[in-house]
From Swiss-Prot:
<dbReference type="GO" id="GO:0006412">
    <property type="term" value="P:translation"/>
</dbReference>
<dbReference type="GO" id="GO:0003735">
    <property type="term" value="F:structural constituent of ribosome"/>
</dbReference>
<comment type="subunit">
    <text>Part of the 50S ribosomal subunit. Contacts protein L32.</text>
</comment>
<dbReference type="InterPro" id="IPR036373">
    <property type="entry name" value="Ribosomal_bL17_sf"/>
</dbReference>
<dbReference type="InterPro" id="IPR047859">
    <property type="entry name" value="Ribosomal_bL17_CS"/>
</dbReference>
<protein>
    <recommendedName>
        <fullName>Large ribosomal subunit protein bL17</fullName>
    </recommendedName>
</protein>
<keyword id="KW-0689">Ribosomal protein</keyword>
<dbReference type="GO" id="GO:0022625">
    <property type="term" value="C:cytosolic large ribosomal subunit"/>
</dbReference>
<comment type="similarity">
    <text>Belongs to the bacterial ribosomal protein bL17 family.</text>
</comment>
<dbReference type="InterPro" id="IPR000456">
    <property type="entry name" value="Ribosomal_bL17"/>
</dbReference>
<keyword id="KW-0687">Ribonucleoprotein</keyword>
<dbReference type="Pfam" id="PF01196">
    <property type="entry name" value="Ribosomal_L17"/>
</dbReference>
Length: 140
């Protein structure tokens, strides 16, 4: 029985999951919005929210903890300098997950995960897809 076991395995080993979540967190912090499957989005949300809380603490130990998880100094500096200051007055709830239909190849449920008050000029993959879809709708 699997009672009391939190988290999803996502058909990956523990090391693969850890690396995947680190890469997804770095991409989400860099682009402020990513498109992924719904289960991955639900799993990455608490990881990134905890990283933002570390960024809000702002001390050296918090920065080292963030670097140990993300392993990209440029992303950590953006987290601590830009994102943490943006959410200085907000107590949690930094991310939103919006369902985005189903992937054509395998019908997997897709989702857009983004920062709540994100920079509108930080164009993520979902923005480019949305703009292309709007242009096709206008042309049709």
């Amino acid at each position: 029985m699997r009672h009391g076991k939190a988290g999803r395995k996502l058909n990956r080993t523990a090391s693969h999951r850890k690396a995947m979540f680190a890469n997804m967190a770095a991409s989400l912090i860099t682009h402020e919005q990513i498109v992924t499957t719904l289960p991955k989005a639900k799993e990455i949300r608490p990881i990134v929210e905890k990283l933002v809380t570390l960024g809000k603490r702002g001390d050296l130990h918090a920065r080292r903890q963030a670097i140990s998880q993300i392993r990209d100094a440029a992303v950590v500096s953006k987290l601590f300098d830009t994102i943490a200051t943006r959410y200085a007055t907000r107590n949690g709830g930094y991310l939103r997950i919006m369902k985005a239909g189903f992937r054509q190849g395998d019908n997997a449920a897709m989702a857009v995960i983004e920062f709540v008050d994100r920079d509108a000029y930080a164009k993520g993959a979902a923005d480019k897809a949305r703009v292309a879809a709007e242009e096709q709708a206008v042309a049709a």
